[in-house]
Amino acid sequence: MRSFIKAHKKSTSFDESPKRHSNFSGNTNNSSQRSSDDSLDFLPSTPSQMNYDSIPPPAKHSPGFESFHRLANKTSKLFKKTSNSNLNSHLASTPTTSTNQTTSNSFVLQNPPTKNTGPPPPLPPPLFPSSSTSSFSRHDNESEYTAYKKTSPAKDFNRTTDSLPAIKGTITHSWGDSKVESHVIILNDPASPASNTSEATSSKQFKTPIIGNENLTSTTSPSNLEPAIRILNKNKGKQQENIDDAEDGSSKKEHHVYKALALAKNRNRQARIHSHDDIINLGKASQMDMSLLAAAFSGNSTTTINNDQSSNEQTDEKILDIERVTTTSTLTSSETTSPINKSPCFYSQTLSLSPKIRHGDLQSSPSKVNKNDSQNETLNKKKVRISLNRKEEEKVYSLNNNSDEYSVNEKETHKANDCNDESSENGDGDNDHDDDYDDDDDDDDDDDESEFSFEYAGINVRTSSVKYYSKPEPAANVYIDDLYEDENFDDDMNCIEDDESGNEGNEICGLSTRFEETSLKSNKVKKFNDLFNLSDDDEEEDGKDNSNNGDENESDNLYQKRLENGKETFNGNHGGHHDDASLGETVDNKEQFLINDNVKKPIQKYNDLFDLSDEDDNDDKEMSEAESYMFSDEAPSIESGPANAKSTRGIYSQSNKNIIRDGKPNYSFSLKRNNSDDETEHTSAIKASLTGTTGSTKPTVKSFSDIFNVDDSASDAESDSGTGGNNSNGLVSNDSERQVSLQSSLYETKSESHPPNHPHSQILQTPAKIVITPSVSDAQSQALAITDDDGEDDDDDTSSILRTPFQLIDSSHSQQPHYASPQYTAVLNSPPLPPPARSQSLKYHDLNCDLDSEVPRPMSNLFFIDEAEEDEYNQKSKFFDFDHYDIDEINGIPEDFNFSDSERDDLNRRTLKSPLRGGSKNREVSPFSSVSSSFRSTHSFNGKLTINQGAKELAPMKNKIELTNKTVTFFNSNNWNTYDCNSLSRKTSSQMRDSKYQNHNVGQNVEPSSVLSPQHQISNGLDGKCNDNYVISPNLPTTITPTNSFTKPTPEFSNDYSLSPIQETPSSVQSSPKRA
């Protein structure tokens, strides 16, 4: 309480200072000459602290206003927020004396008076909240009102606002460019109509408070708690005339330091932020035109509106008649006012959330207007030109119809609703401005100009209300999580529907699913991104769609040509014993031909690998082993009769060159797959015809152990004997017999054959078994199948065959050297191991690091030896070295690790070798043999980091055990054998010599220096360094006595002695039992 009294006394004495008192009194005298012709001004938002002579002393400070001294010292808050309860009680207790007084939650601007208008009657104080809860009496309003003086608005503004109490702060909001003629909305205008002071000395104020005429129940709404928009026009001083030089000089003479402070406060608090409700209420109850906002934001100070022109635009433009003029006060204006004062009206309709208001709708070309006519027209009727669509107009008039104050005429409503139709139909207006306005309506939705958006704000919350920038709407995001898993989508996230619905939708657009699929398949893979357009389902549906595509005629022609060639070849070789019906020319065969001709494409490039799919392997599982022979180059050509003795039966070579062939078979044949019984009989007949020439067959490789039963030496011996004993006549006879048996087996069956197809189009996609077919002319065993193709074919007949790294070589050429010759050993590369069965597992260490780029097929088609079969074979073959593998597995050493630096590799080399290479005598020339060195040697991890940083060579074991209370060290014994370069289980030769000389010298008293040479001592050091077990080589002891009777002991140990564990800490003494 004492501090409050002291601050009150200081502030009172501060306000009654001579300089400030004299300055304020001069300003008061000058302001007393003000008339009612001044421009549009606003009441201050904060109570004044000026010490006027005409104001009674009790009214210097409001009850709720803090002293300027405390505000300047920042000892309290700058702004006080009143609660709703106090505000409601204050509003309820405020006396009202006006006859037309009603409370309202909206703001109403009255008509500007004429020049000859008399002074307005005294009005009651405003009913709007402010930053303080103070209230003044009517006597204060009247006494302060009589002090006005007719002066220039700009000069009077500079004089009167300097005396206002100021609060230090910064400008937090500013709009527009920093120009001289720009209009700026300034926050917290002290000349605010929401202030409870009677009259302000600033020119920016109303002479009368702004009072609405709305319902009484809306006084406590949130919109009533916010002040109105205050707009400052900086260019008023340039438009005024007859400036009083004497008054200007008097204001410049008496300049106080507090004037700048008061002016800063006045500039920082000349406007306040509104909520959305306040903006709507302003539009409902006011008479201002939208050009008010246009003048504030556009920066054009000379913008005026021709009221005569707007009065003639009722027929062609959207003109809304506003008859809700319920104001009781008048707007002050000077002789030559700014365009804000000339504003005819403000529209009374509700603003939408974000209406697009163009500058062309708000502004018009400047023109000279008769002031009396414009004022009379403003008093009678106010017209507003706004651009609204039909929905907004309906909303506007629906709100007006629901109002209790008045009702809108039906004709006016009909006029506003038909506004768009009239503007579009009536292209010719009364003047040029109407035409421009109608043309601009079409582009209203497409312009990128600024938009006004109004946001909701809480009570006394400083948030931005007007956004004059446009904000584009963000594009809607599509998330994959919102899609269902069972639906199919392509790369562009287009749903692939079922066949029926998809066809219906595509036929409407003039497309079909077949066209899309064929266009997709026809595109070759040219870039990396094209790989993602391929799918495994393309080839599966290719056979179904090719019968209906645009290439049907070409397929029929190709089909007919191959069918006729097959007929001619068949009839020429067999003399017409079989008719054309045996070829099975049916519609199903034609479809099968089309499928096989299109699906199974030759693999000639790397891009062709992506045309393959796993469905091909599933379909080709039905083909048997004999069918693979029949459709490969091993199958003899039917075209070649007894006269043509050259057979196409060949084997695979080790080079990746073209196929060496003599004859080109023009006849192709296939089997009907749906007849399993006939297929079994047919395949058995073919096997007998192919392998029954010599009368003995070799078993087929069906498991892991069958691979090792193949002996390369036997095939070498047969090749030697067969090459020397047979001649060309024998080859011809053997080939002719094979052809006759094959032909008889082909047509003894009752199965219908498929239509002729490409000779190799139906080759197996799954790996076939390795079949050993002995022959006199053939030197090696023949490996058939594997679906991979890693080379380009120049031959047309072999273009679609899928080959292994082996190549076909015609075995009928007896003059060609066999594999034992040195020519082929230099040219031929070593092939990989033959693949076992399909259902066997894959070991990660069986893959080479370069296989990722070399393997053309998916990883699911790579087949490797099963570990279970390998272990079973090792058990049968009595290879028991599992301890070695177990230790390596524990240490994290891979199985293909090469122990080339130890004796272990030399001792176990014969046991670790693959049995494939041990069974053949001619290992270098075997078609299944690799290089002479093993895979472990060529692909070892020697010199590289191993898994889990495993040991790459033998390292000593840890000889210490650290327990909780002691550390135990163990030493090596004599019988502990290790693998190293010198076999440390026994002494080295140098150590043996050293020990012998030592014992001899001790017994004979001979100095060791005369016995050993320096070179020998150096060699002892080298032997010690070569010891991998870190056993220090014992050197000769240094003698102490001349007779060498005593030798100095050395603190070292060797492997020759077994020592007990040594406890290196005295913990054993502590753990021993203590005496009492």
Swiss-Prot record:
It comes from Saccharomyces cerevisiae (strain ATCC 204508 / S288c). Residues 23-34, 107-117, 193-206, 214-223, 362-378, 690-701, 739-748 have a biased composition (Polar residues). GO terms for biological process: fungal-type cell wall organization. Signal peptide: none annotated. Keywords: Cytoplasm, Phosphoprotein, Zinc. Residues 419-450 have a biased composition (Acidic residues). Residues 1-11 have a biased composition (Basic residues). Residues 408-418, 576-585 have a biased composition (Basic and acidic residues). Its main location: cytoplasm. The keyword Electron transport does not apply. This is Zinc-regulated protein 8. Belongs to the ZRG8 family. Induction: Repressed by zinc.
